[in-house]
């Protein structure tokens, strides 16, 4: 009713962009007449206008003035290079992003293409633009795909990947537009602020950032800070002993069922993700370990036992982590991908290694950390896009000061969201999922099933294999990760069945009928790899093809002969047939064979790396002009294969549309309604037909942990068969209530993480600013003398009480302390200070320090010119890093301890702020004092006589 009276505020907001859209459309005709070179020269024209405009505010005014023409130029370039033209609604999306807002754009509406508009415009300043995605695969895809537009227009495009060297990172960050993941950006920022030389710094000053899947990065991942750790020595045998004790302890029943304390050795709170020993548990653990007290400071055990219990109860193999090559590798809870190299902190990872009987790696200590909230707030202008932002609008506004605008779809939505089916037990739910998948598959429609863990995806895979339903599995297991792009390329084909772990975070569109462009590139890769790639690199064809080759082509026959006992094998064999839409004609096969021979002559026989070949195929897939004959030949081959595949893919697309489009099945409600909506959004892209349904059970984690007593009573109330779905308004309300409860719960956690990290953030920025000044070598001598002057002030204030008469001041102690710091003042006598006021004392000692420092500098510089500045930089960085590391530990300990002060009617956050501030001031004072002491004690070794080389 309010909307009818006042109008839709979002529509009113978007209406102001319409005149600019009209301007861009008017410019389109003139810009279409330009040649490629003339279009490219527009970039230089735009950039010239920024030559004398250096301040951020003035640059923003100029960017706004250039927007209509710049957007028209990008639209024309995208038409020529990608064959894609920005719709009017995409232009509006680009304006929303340019203004530093969050644009909600439904799945399939071309978010990736929209990002080219503001990223090009803001790159014209020369300050650099970061486009952020959730994983390396998407960053690479977008840099290759959308980067074509920017490269065509004369901008440089960089890409940051996990395994890059610092030199490669520096080169890529120096580009006009850099594609990277949120974690790589954050860790590079932390590493830059641990660098000991300016040449080690890879990032430049932040300017503008566009985040794809912004809710995933700024909301879902905001609970976990980015941490860089260093190793610390701890007795490793304790982890294994603790794991053995934990295995022997028994979990208590749920708390408070009959008002009686639970029996058992420890309690588990899944909501808080914590384990607590009972009195019996403490006694049993102490008895097993033969110790008197688990908290004995000389031999502490409590921390080890708690971590071992959490490893046993809360960290599940193939859900939270997988075991690969003798290591426990974390699985990202939001994307379902493995995160090699990442480890849980505080001894938790070691506890999991002990549980799994793996080699235990050394424990780590935090060297640097930051939350995503505070990291992204470092950008002067931040923007983001996602399919689902409106549900988190308040949090975006409060935490990040980001407005949210909903961009209208280009075509009306035609997706049907079918009613949820709820089952009493989990096993009944999975049988129902398998049955619906089989039914939809028979109709010739593609099916995407979203699961929440590796374990669940493999359970469903085995159920489908029993029914001989061919399917592809996409989860964190290594053999499946390697096939991600290939699986997604096929997921929209007629009858295709894809099981994906956390598909919501994968950011990849599923095209009805299949992606002929990618399949053509895959075919070319398959033909060229054995001829062009070095043998040690390996040239594995796509996984199912390789397995078929290993069995001499009788894969399906052998599986069939086994009377269904190898259902999974048969399922994969059938999936092989769907890898490519059709066989190529003999002419095209011969054409590809001839191409391989010609490329061997130019590039060498098996002389390339896999990455080099893939880069060349990616370049060939672009539409930008090329003078390279080999790239042109590759491009012709891709086009030829794609043309043949298109015939079948187009027919399949028609069949799939007629059958009803993609069907998406959710197998569990996520903790957030937004993530459920992301999964639904995979179906019905750009006005396509499609449908979705969620299958749930009363045993699902969400209902079990957050549903409370109401769900428990419902389980007893429903006296129906296991295989009968339950439909109940009361149950639906319980479900929505549970989701709202968990959303509020996690919002409070994120808010608390942010509030506490805000205290650290102010300190971090001060320390990192000091470090950067030192790295850049700006006024080092002046800075150290400033440290010395403040140290002299500290000494005076410590030993002189202004409330006492001057004759009672302990000047002997004061002089002794000054000489501890500055041994060159050994001739200073207390008599020289008599009769001076407190301020005069400070001034006198500061002058003495400056004179002593000049003498010290003369001594050091005699050894080697420039050595004094090197020593200053070394000692300042050494002290900052050492004391900051200790300060981080102290702040962690403070944060844990202030929680108890709530019982004393004190606000823990205010206590943390006040005490943390005092600790920070003390740390900075210690840093200044230690630097002064180190500088005066510094005695460089004489340079050794140069020996003749005897090599």
Curated annotation (Swiss-Prot):
EC number(s) given by UniProt: 7.4.2.8
Residues annotated as binding ATP: 90, 108-112, 509
Protein name: Protein translocase subunit SecA
One GO process term, biological-process aspect: protein import
SMART domains: SecA_DEAD, SecA_PP_bind
GO MF, one annotated term: protein-exporting ATPase activity
Subcellular location, principal: membrane
Keyword Protein transport: yes
Reactions catalysed: ATP + H2O + cellular proteinSide 1 = ADP + phosphate + cellular proteinSide 2
Alphabetical UniProt keywords: ATP-binding, Cell inner membrane, Cell membrane, Cytoplasm, Membrane, Nucleotide-binding, Protein transport, Thylakoid, Translocase, Translocation, Transport
Topology with respect to the bilayer: Peripheral membrane protein
NCBIfam families xrefs: secA
Organism per entry: Prochlorococcus marinus (strain MIT 9303)
Keyword check for Membrane: yes
Protein purpose: Part of the Sec protein translocase complex. Interacts with the SecYEG preprotein conducting channel. Has a central role in coupling the hydrolysis of ATP to the transfer of proteins into and across the cell membrane, serving as an ATP-driven molecular motor driving the stepwise translocation of polypeptide chains across the membrane. Probably participates in protein translocation into and across both the cytoplasmic and thylakoid membranes in cyanobacterial cells.
Cellular component GO terms held in the UniProt record: cell envelope Sec protein transport complex; cytosol; plasma membrane-derived thylakoid membrane
InterPro entries documented for this protein: Helicase_ATP-bd, P-loop_NTPase, SecA, SecA_CS, SecA_DEAD, SecA_motor_DEAD, SecA_preprotein_X-link_dom, SecA_SF2_C
Assembly, per entry: Monomer and homodimer. Part of the essential Sec protein translocation apparatus which comprises SecA, SecYEG and auxiliary proteins SecDF. Other proteins may also be involved.
Location in or out of the cell: Cell inner membrane; Cellular thylakoid membrane; Cytoplasm
Family recorded in the similarity comment: Belongs to the SecA family.
């Amino acid at each position: 009713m309010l909307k009818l009276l006042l109008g839709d505020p979002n529509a009113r907001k978007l209406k102001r962009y319409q005149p600019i859209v009209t301007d861009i459309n008017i410019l389109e005709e003139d810009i279409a007449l330009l040649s490629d070179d003339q279009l490219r020269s527009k970039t230089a024209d735009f950039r010239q206008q920024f030559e004398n405009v250096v301040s951020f505010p003035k640059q923003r005014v100029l960017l706004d003035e250039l927007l209509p023409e710049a957007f028209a130029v990008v639209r024309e370039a995208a038409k020529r290079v990608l064959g894609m033209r920005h719709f009017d609604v995409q232009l509006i999306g680009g304006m929303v992003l340019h203004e530093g807002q969050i644009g909600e754009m439904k799945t399939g509406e071309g978010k990736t293409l929209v990002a080219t508009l503001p990223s090009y415009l803001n790159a014209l300043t020369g300050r650099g633009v970061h486009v952020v995605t959730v994983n390396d695969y998407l960053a690479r895809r977008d840099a290759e795909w959308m980067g074509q537009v920017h490269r065509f227009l004369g901008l440089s495009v960089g890409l940051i990947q996990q395994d890059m060297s610092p030199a490669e990172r520096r080169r890529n960050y120096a580009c006009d537009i850099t594609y990277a993941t949120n974690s790589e950006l954050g860790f590079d920022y932390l590493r830059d602020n641990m660098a000991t030389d300016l040449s080690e710094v890879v990032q430049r000053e932040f300017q503008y950032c566009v985040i794809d899947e912004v809710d995933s990065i700024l909301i879902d991942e905001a609970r976990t800070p980015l941490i860089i750790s260093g190793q610390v020595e701890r007795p490793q045998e304790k982890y294994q002993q603790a794991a053995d004790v934990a295995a022997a302890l028994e979990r208590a029943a749920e708390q408070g069922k009959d008002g009686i304390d639970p029996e058992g050795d420890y309690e588990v709170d899944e909501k808080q993700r914590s384990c607590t020993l009972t009195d019996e548990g403490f006694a049993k653990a102490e008895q097993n370990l033969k110790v008197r007290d688990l908290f004995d400071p000389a031999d502490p055990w409590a921390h080890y036992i708690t971590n071992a219990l959490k490893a046993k109860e809360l960290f599940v193999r193939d859900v939270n982590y997988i075991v690969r090559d003798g290591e426990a590798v974390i699985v990202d809870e939001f994307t379902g991908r493995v995160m090699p190299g990442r480890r849980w902190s505080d001894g938790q990872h070691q506890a999991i290694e002990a549980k799994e009987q793996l080699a235990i790696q050394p424990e780590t200590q935090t060297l640097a950390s930051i939350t995503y909230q505070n990291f992204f707030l470092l950008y002067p202008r931040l923007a983001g896009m996602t399919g689902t932002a409106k549900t988190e609008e308040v949090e975006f506004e409060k935490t990040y000061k980001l407005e949210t605008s909903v961009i209208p779809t280009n075509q009306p939505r035609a997706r049907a969201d079918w009613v949820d089916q709820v089952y009493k037990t989990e096993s009944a739910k999975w049988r129902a999922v398998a049955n619906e998948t089989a039914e939809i598959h028979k109709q010739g429609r593609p099916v995407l099933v979203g699961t929440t863990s590796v374990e669940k995806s493999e359970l469903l895979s085995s159920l489908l294999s029993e029914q001989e339903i061919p399917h592809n599995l996409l989860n964190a297991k290594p053999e499946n990760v390697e096939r991600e792009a290939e699986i997604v390329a096929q997921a929209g084909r007629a009858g295709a069945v894809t099981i994906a772990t956390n598909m919501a975070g994968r950011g990849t569109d599923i095209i009805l009928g299949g992606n002929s462009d990618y399949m053509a590139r895959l075919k070319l890769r398959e033909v060229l790899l054995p001829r062009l790639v070095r043998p040690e690199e390996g040239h594995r064809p796509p996984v199912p093809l390789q397995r078929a080759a290993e069995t001499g082509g009788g894969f399906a026959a052998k599986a069939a002969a086994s009377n269904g006992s190898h259902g999974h094998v048969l399922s994969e064999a059938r999936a092989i047939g769907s890898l490519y839409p059709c066989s190529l004609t003999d002419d095209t096969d011969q054409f590809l064979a001839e191409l391989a021979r010609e490329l061997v002559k130019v590039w060498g026989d098996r002389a390339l790396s896999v990455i080099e070949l893939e880069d060349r195929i990616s370049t060939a897939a672009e539409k930008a002009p090329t003078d390279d004959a080999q790239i042109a030949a590759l491009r012709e081959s891709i086009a030829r294969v794609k043309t043949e595949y298109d015939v079948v893919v187009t027919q399949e697309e028609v069949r799939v549309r007629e059958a009803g489009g993609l069907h998406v099945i959710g197998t569990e409600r996520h903790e957030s309604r937004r993530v459920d909506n992301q999964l639904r959004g995979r179906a019905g892209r750009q006005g396509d037909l499609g449908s979705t349904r969620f299958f749930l059970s009363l045993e699902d984690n969400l209902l079990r942990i957050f549903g409370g007593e109401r769900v428990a009573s419902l389980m007893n109330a429903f006296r129906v068969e296991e295989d009968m779905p339950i439909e109940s308004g009361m149950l639906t309300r319980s479900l929505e209530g549970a989701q709202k409860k968990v959303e509020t719960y996690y919002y409070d956690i994120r808010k608390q993480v942010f509030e506490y990290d805000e205290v650290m953030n102010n300190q971090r920025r001060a320390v990192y600013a000091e470090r950067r000044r030192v790295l850049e070598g700006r006024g080092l001598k002046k800075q150290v003398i400033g440290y010395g002057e403040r140290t002299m002030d500290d000494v005076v204030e410590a030993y002189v009480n202004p409330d006492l008469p001057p004759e009672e001041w302990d000047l002997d102690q004061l002089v002794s302390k000054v000489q501890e710091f500055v041994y060159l003042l050994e001739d200073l006598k207390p008599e020289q200070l008599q009769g001076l006021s407190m301020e005069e004392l400070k001034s006198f000692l500061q002058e003495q320090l400056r004179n002593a420092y000049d003498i010290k500098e003369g001594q050091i510089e005699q050894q080697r010119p420039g050595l004094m500045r090197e020593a200053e930089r070394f000692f300042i960085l050494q002290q900052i890093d050492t004391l900051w590391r200790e300060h981080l530990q102290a702040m962690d300990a403070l944060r844990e301890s202030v929680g108890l002060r709530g019982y004393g009617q004190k606000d823990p956050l205010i206590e943390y702020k006040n005490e943390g501030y005092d600790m920070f001031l003390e740390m900075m004072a210690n840093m200044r004092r230690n630097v002064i002491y180190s500088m005066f004690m510094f005695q460089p070794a004489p340079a050794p006589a140069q020996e003749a080389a005897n090599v």
